[in-house]
């Protein structure tokens, strides 16, 4: 019998098939790495846009001057977007490096993605609350409707908050990706049948 046929029958795959499979795996991992890198760079652009827009948000008229720094919610939004922009750039560089992913690295990305998702979500939420008070006012806490006198300021703040919510969506997607990459490393649990000595996988990937 031909040796190539024997190897095919015994091993199930020829050497050519193994080489082709490994190349396909490399191409797939490379495309996944590129996609994740782009996904991590996209929120950085939005973070910088929201940050710069809010930093330049100031209006002066006959009623006085109103700046983003006068409101703690907007200061937090600036800081949160700055932190997320830096993390997005750093994580994109790390992901783009062609190195094998370890369990500790997967856990680190999972943890940081989750934390920063909630950080930027909180920034967007408190900014919306501040904008609501600025537009509607609150007599109980003697908060006047500032948007009546500072309409331009409020419009820029709304735009920055909307962009921040887009960042939240991006980070939610990143959290899903890092969760999948982490928990897909764990094998399926085995189900044992007592007395029969048979173990089967509960599910297959």
Curated annotation (Swiss-Prot):
It holds the Pfam family CASP_dom. Disulfide bonds: none annotated. It is a multi-pass membrane protein. Its main location: membrane. Residues 1-34, 98-105, 178-205 are cytoplasmic. GO terms for cellular component: plasma membrane. Residues 1-25 are annotated as: Disordered. Keywords: Cell membrane, Membrane, Transmembrane, Transmembrane helix. This is CASP-like protein 2A1. The chain crosses the membrane at residues 35-55, 77-97, 106-126, 157-177. It comes from Ricinus communis. It is found in: Cell membrane. Belongs to the Casparian strip membrane proteins (CASP) family. Homodimer and heterodimers.
